[in-house]
Amino acid sequence: MERTFVYLKPNTIQRQLIGEVISRFERKGLKIVALKMLKMTMEQAEKLYEEHKGKDFYKPLLKFVTSGPIVAMILEGPRAVEVVRHVIGKTDPLEANSGTIRGEFGVTIRKNIVHASDSPEHAKHEMSIFFDTSEIVDYKLLLEEQF
């Protein structure tokens, strides 16, 4: 099974959309194997967005993602990275399809509700920024149980 990293941005928490967003992932068959609310540190933000260092949106992005609480999670399932990217929609909410998380709830490119890893390799790196392996829980869903 593939795992991917997702976090809900501060505006998602402020708009009380946590349950709505998480339920969309669960309805697609993804399993939450790690979940926590935290305030992202500047060090975590710099590691997460290091590929954008030097770009004009880098500092405002770091300021935004460290401005309030986030909900970080690891989701597991077949083709988890691809499934999550499909569910959340394009980065720009104006270009995201209706029915996607960003298409329905996103406001701007920065305040687009959710961050999700764009590849299995990035997912591994991003998970390590926010979670120790001891925080990842391996379990079976009822649907996975053998009777």
From Swiss-Prot:
Pfam families: NDK (PF00334). Homotetramer. The active site is at H115 (pros-phosphohistidine intermediate). Its EC number is 2.7.4.6. This is Nucleoside diphosphate kinase. ATP binds at K9, F57, R85, T91, R102, N112. Its main location: cytoplasm. One of its GO terms (cellular component) is cytoplasm. It catalyses: a 2'-deoxyribonucleoside 5'-diphosphate + ATP = a 2'-deoxyribonucleoside 5'-triphosphate + ADP; a ribonucleoside 5'-diphosphate + ATP = a ribonucleoside 5'-triphosphate + ADP. GO terms for biological process: CTP biosynthetic process; GTP biosynthetic process; UTP biosynthetic process. Keywords: ATP-binding, Cytoplasm, Kinase, Magnesium, Metal-binding, Nucleotide metabolism, Nucleotide-binding, Phosphoprotein, Transferase. Its cofactor is Mg(2+). One of its GO terms (molecular function) is ATP binding. CDD domains: NDPk_I. It is an enzyme of class 2 (transferase).
